[in-house]
């Protein structure tokens, strides 16, 4: 969890809590890897929000709350502000928002980044007001976006390769918070 801009890990069984980050800047928007050994987060470093990961390094240590050695690594560091990271279901890629409105994906092996949903499809009033979710198979994103140059959000499917965007709702009303079932 995040409190006062720092990341903490807590055991639900033993009421133990450990501070994971300890920086003068903020961290937020955490996302766990499927094996639970890595946490993605947005961190404010050098006057810019970027994407980082922190991992357990010792094989015998299974939980962040009881870890002794952690390794922090930058994932996406650019002049642009980047937020809301999320691991792909297979853990090989990281989705994130650039400048609050552009959905992008970074391949962890190649470090290449591709655009999934362009800026023209979103508008942000504040941090965290944009949502997206990987499909269970990692081939699509469920998104809320602004088609047709209007301000009512529709729910869409955006392909993970960034080549297709399908409007699922075609509604004249505001649609928001879609979920995979």
Which residues does each PLM region occupy?
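Hydrophobic alpha-helical and helix-loop surface patches within well-folded domains
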Residues: 164, 176-177
């Amino acid at each position: 969890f995040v409190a006062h801009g720092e990341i903490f890990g807590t055991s639900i069984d033993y009421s133990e809590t450990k501070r994971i980050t300890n920086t003068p800047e903020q961290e937020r928007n955490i996302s766990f890897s499927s094996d639970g050994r890595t946490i993605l987060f947005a961190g404010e470093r050098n006057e810019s929000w970027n994407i980082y990961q922190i991992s357990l390094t010792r094989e015998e240590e299974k939980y962040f709350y009881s870890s002794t050695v952690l390794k922090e690594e930058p994932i996406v560091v650019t002049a642009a502000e980047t937020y809301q990271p999320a691991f792909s279901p297979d853990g090989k890629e990281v989705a994130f928002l650039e400048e609050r409105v552009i959905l992008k994906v970074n391949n962890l092996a190649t470090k290449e980044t591709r655009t999934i949903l362009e800026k023209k499809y979103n508008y942000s009033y504040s941090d965290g007001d944009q949502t997206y979710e990987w499909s269970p198979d990692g081939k699509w994103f469920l998104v809320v976006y602004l088609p047709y140059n209007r301000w009512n959000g529709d729910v869409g499917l955006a392909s993970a390769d960034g080549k297709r965007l399908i409007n699922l709702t075609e509604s004249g009303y505001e649609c928001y918070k879609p979920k995979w079932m």
